[in-house]
Amino acid sequence: MIRVVHYIKEFFANIGGEEMAHVAPEVREGVVGPG
């Protein structure tokens, strides 16, 4: 099994911009971000 970890900026994950930079990494199921 291969696991892939992909980091997406907070902006594309609908968390916010620089003011939400303190949010810890999290796991989300399904498509998140652009495209």
Curated annotation (Swiss-Prot):
It catalyses: acetyl phosphate + [thioredoxin]-disulfide + NH4(+) + H2O = [thioredoxin]-dithiol + glycine + phosphate + H(+). It is an enzyme of class 1 (oxidoreductase). The keyword Oxidoreductase applies. It comes from the Bacteria. Pfam families: GRDB. Keywords: Oxidoreductase, Selenocysteine. GO terms for molecular function: glycine reductase activity. Its EC number is 1.21.4.2. Heterohexamer of two alpha, two beta and two gamma subunits. Component of the glycine reductase complex, together with components A and C. PB is substrate specific. Belongs to the GrdB/GrdF/GrdH family. In the first step of glycine reductase, the substrate is bound to component PB via a Schiff base intermediate. Then the PB-activated substrate is nucleophilically attacked by the selenol anion of component PA to transform it to a carboxymethylated selenoether and the respective amine. By action of component PC, acetyl phosphate is formed, leaving component PA in its oxidized state. Finally component PA becomes reduced by the thioredoxin system to start a new catalytic cycle of reductive deamination. This is Glycine reductase complex component B subunit gamma. It comes from Gottschalkia purinilytica.
